[in-house]
């Protein structure tokens, strides 16, 4: 009888000890483990819509963006070209208008001179008036950059400014001397636009070669 009670006491102690161990094990678990939660790794996280895009689709979208930018640049350049062309044409017309208005003044003076010449008995004033008109006319040309090419009789022939239309054999003057001037030459802003037409001396010895 005593042995039976002793055995029951030992079994009770063992049960209490095991129960205490199980209780201690439960208390040492983390809240996440108690709730049965599992930690999600970065690899298992759901990806964003941007990250899920197909590389080919992303490349196609970028290509469309670049194409749109190119079309916009082309349109801007075309508008700039047309605007510049219009502005240049307006400037050309404005300059031409001013030039023509300047020459209209000379035309008015020519008309007055012609009327006076028809009834004048003394041509002296008429000649003087025409000379003044010539000066007025050329002053307008100079205003826009036109000037006479330097060319004088007995001067030296310059192939860059003069054009020899005749050669006169003579030993009285050196070779390449200007003998006669047929037409004046003109330069616009220092560029020869029409050479002076002249005759040039050439020695008989040079002509025989």
From Swiss-Prot:
Disulfide bonds: none annotated. Residues 7-42, 50-63 have a biased composition (Basic and acidic residues). Its main location: cytoplasm. One of its GO terms (biological process) is protein folding. One of its GO terms (cellular component) is cytoplasm. Transmembrane segments: none annotated. It is found in: Cytoplasm. NCBIfam families: PRK14153.1. Participates actively in the response to hyperosmotic and heat shock by preventing the aggregation of stress-denatured proteins, in association with DnaK and GrpE. It is the nucleotide exchange factor for DnaK and may function as a thermosensor. Unfolded proteins bind initially to DnaJ; upon interaction with the DnaJ-bound protein, DnaK hydrolyzes its bound ATP, resulting in the formation of a stable complex. GrpE releases ADP from DnaK; ATP binding to DnaK triggers the release of the substrate protein, thus completing the reaction cycle. This is Protein GrpE.
């Amino acid at each position: 009888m005593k042995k039976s009670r002793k055995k029951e006491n030992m079994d009770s102690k063992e049960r209490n000890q095991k129960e205490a161990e199980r209780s201690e094990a439960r208390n040492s678990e983390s809240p996440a483990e108690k709730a049965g939660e599992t930690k999600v790794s970065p690899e298992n996280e759901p990806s964003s819509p941007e990250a899920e895009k197909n590389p080919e689709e992303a490349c196609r979208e970028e290509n469309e963006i670049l194409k749109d930018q190119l079309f916009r640049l082309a349109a801007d350049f075309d508008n700039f070209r047309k605007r510049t062309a219009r502005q240049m044409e307006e400037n050309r017309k404005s300059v031409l208008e001013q030039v023509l208005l300047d020459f209209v003044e000379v035309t008015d003076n020519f008309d007055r001179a012609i009327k006076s010449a028809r009834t004048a008995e003394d041509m002296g004033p008429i000649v003087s008036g025409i000379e003044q008109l010539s000066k007025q006319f050329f002053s307008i040309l100079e205003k826009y950059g036109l000037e006479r090419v330097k060319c004088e009789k007995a001067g030296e022939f310059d192939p860059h400014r003069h054009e020899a239309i005749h050669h006169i054999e003579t030993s009285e003057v050196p070779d390449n001397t200007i003998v006669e001037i047929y037409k004046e030459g003109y330069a616009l802003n220092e560029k020869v636009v029409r050479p002076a037409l002249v005759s040039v001396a050439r020695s008989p010895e040079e002509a025989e070669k």
